[in-house]
Amino acid sequence: KEGYLVNSYTGCKYECLKLGDNDYCLRECRQQYGKSGGYCYAFACWCTHLYEQAVVWPLPNKTCN
């Protein structure tokens, strides 16, 4: 499974500025999901190699504001 890293409280994606390989995204994805990968895609952190139950953006009933 893959998807955008999401803040479970706000429903917002984790933003990033350096597209492609990105240490911040990799660190955040691994911190939240263990052995996942991560990079910056469309100015948000995209996590790879997630388990199927991983929670990713968008969250039901939560809009980012």
UniProtKB/Swiss-Prot annotation:
It comes from the Eukaryota. One of its GO terms (molecular function) is toxin activity. Expressed by the venom gland. PROSITE patterns: LCN_CSAB (PS51863). InterPro entries: LCN-type_CS_alpha_beta_dom, Scorpion_toxin-like, Scorpion_toxin-like_sf, Scorpion_toxinL, Scorpion_toxinL/defensin. One of its GO terms (cellular component) is extracellular region. The keyword Nucleotide-binding does not apply. Keywords: Disulfide bond, Ion channel impairing toxin, Neurotoxin, Secreted, Toxin, Voltage-gated sodium channel impairing toxin. The keyword DNA repair does not apply. Belongs to the long (4 C-C) scorpion toxin superfamily. Sodium channel inhibitor family. Beta subfamily. This is Toxin CsEM1.
